[in-house]
């Protein structure tokens, strides 16, 4: 499971600077859910091939209202959700009363905490360690977040306590080579044992719990329910029509005898972890409310992680025909960026349309993990280029030579050629749509990566042989004589 790291500390100690450095915010998946997260900011980060989630909390001043009152706003929940805490202090300002209150709270919560002394670029690290040793959280890890100093050592300490998942998900990452002439194939992964892992996500009160109960209803064969390693998330294997699935529930469903009691409990961390761990995401929206901003935020995270997607519009049965038409128009307008996903209009309460979700889940999963030979992908590229050539760059045509599969879940197609760094985004979208249409991909994002061929002669001066030099001299002499004869003739 993806580790969760919370950044905690009083105001202006550099939490946001460290957050931006860890997540590389320009490229990172950063989601801010106002009103739901109480101003906490969540981001996905990677270090040495490991993925983890970072929570940037608000500053804690420790004023007369007390540490608990302040932390209840945002930081207390972040600490509870986190696997480990990076407690940041300011080396320049030294230890304060607020630092002592926060350290005391962390010790009481018995959380895995690492003391991080920021801004050591102008302070001796040994002095900083001695300054904060009374906090009782071990030796401080000295860093300079603004300049990136000490970050690797800090991450080594914080992430080293978690087991490395070296196995990963089969079907992800680098794809194995499919021999020329072979048919596309799907390679069995861990999901063959536990079934396709489905995460049902969405805003609070859109009907996630009702849908979970409906999918695990009396007509289904429930094998067992087992608490996962994530806080309050439950992994529930079940079968339907002899197909195996594992439902990742983030709504707090608990089994009591034959009754599943649903407790609506929204947690951004649980949602993000469920998305990361799933093969397919069923995204639930409330048809009566249409598409709202929080839906777009969550959908954006799903697309960035590359997970296969099925959209379910719940509470459809109670709507008038005019309302339904309006919602469909809004969906088409606002969800253009996810137009590859199947949309189902359902009633989780009455079961209407729920059974059709499984067909889309299967299709999305197959599209996400199927592998194609290089010959097929290259032929599709050649046909696409012949139909619509890439633009000219400085008078030279961009050349796309061949394509191969670079990964799956989501499919990654690597295209080799010349001047590929100049390929416009519009042309990349054209290629994505072409591959999606020809390969009949549904329910999964598709990614295209370009690789250019290095010019072995770049930066090298061409040296001529003696024979070539003599030939060049003769040609130049001949050219001069011909030019002189032409001028004399004009006179």
Curated annotation (Swiss-Prot):
Residues 370-454 form the KH-like domain. Keywords: GTP-binding, Nucleotide-binding, Repeat, Ribosome biogenesis. GTP 2 binds at residues 202-209, 249-253, 314-317. One of its GO terms (biological process) is ribosome biogenesis. Signal peptide: none annotated. Residues 3-166, 196-369 form the EngA-type G domain. Residues 470-491 have a biased composition (Basic residues). Residues 182-191, 452-464 have a biased composition (Basic and acidic residues). CDD domains: EngA1, EngA2. Residues 164-191, 452-491 are annotated as: Disordered. It comes from the Bacteria. The keyword GTP-binding applies. The keyword Nucleotide-binding applies. Gene3D superfamilies: 3.30.300.20, P-loop containing nucleotide triphosphate hydrolases. GO terms for molecular function: GTP binding; ribosome binding. InterPro entries: G_ENGA (IPR031166), GTP-bd (IPR006073), GTPase_Der (IPR016484), KH_dom-like (IPR032859), KH_dom-like_a/b (IPR015946), P-loop_NTPase (IPR027417), Small_GTP-bd (IPR005225). GTP 1 binds at residues 9-16, 56-60, 118-121. Residues 166-181 have a biased composition (Acidic residues). Belongs to the TRAFAC class TrmE-Era-EngA-EngB-Septin-like GTPase superfamily. EngA (Der) GTPase family. Associates with the 50S ribosomal subunit. GTPase that plays an essential role in the late steps of ribosome biogenesis. This is GTPase Der. It comes from Azotobacter vinelandii (strain DJ / ATCC BAA-1303).
